[in-house]
UniProtKB/Swiss-Prot annotation:
The keyword Transferase does not apply. The keyword Membrane applies. It is a multi-pass membrane protein. Partially overlaps ECM1. Signal peptide: none annotated. It is found in: Membrane. GO terms for cellular component: membrane. This is Putative uncharacterized membrane protein YAL059C-A. Keywords: Membrane, Transmembrane, Transmembrane helix. Its main location: membrane. The chain crosses the membrane at residues 42-62, 65-85, 96-116.
């Protein structure tokens, strides 16, 4: 049991704990750290594939789809990103410490997703081949 808690603590980088302390002005107990680690990992496994799919759809819409399909995909992408942003606000307004820490974890994932989307868009705009795109992603 103690080893599992140490592993959960190791999964959460100290940078996020510093952010959390600055955000709430208090320290965390081991149970709160463990709960936040589990909830952020569950969020990652549930929503990251959807975000990746939406990023590829958004790139497809901006590069070679018809106008109507491009508009529909853009609306879908923007609505999902705004829904995720509002869920971040509800996480942050929660009273439990684990919810706040999970919101910070989600915000880091969200920022990484936006950077990944910009990176893929820049590659597609260069009109590279699919093999070159795969080699870029391999070294990303």
């Amino acid at each position: 049991m103690y080893l599992a808690r140490e592993m959960d603590l190791a999964i959460l980088p100290s940078r996020r704990l510093v952010k959390f302390k600055a955000f709430t002005k208090r320290s965390l107990s081991m149970d709160e750290i463990e709960l936040a680690s589990l909830s952020s990992r569950a969020f990652l496994f549930n929503f990251l594939p959807l975000l990746l799919l939406l990023a590829f759809l958004d790139i497809f819409a901006s590069s070679n789809a018809s106008f109507l399909a491009a508009v529909l995909i853009k609306i879908l992408v923007k609505s999902v990103f705004s829904a995720l942003g509002s869920s971040l606000k509800s996480f942050t307004s929660g009273s439990r410490a684990s919810d706040c820490l999970a919101a910070l974890e989600f915000f880091d994932i969200f920022l990484a997703m936006l950077c990944f989307r910009r990176y893929l868009t820049s590659i597609v705009k260069e009109k590279t081949t699919f093999c070159r795109l795969c080699s870029h992603i391999q070294y990303f």
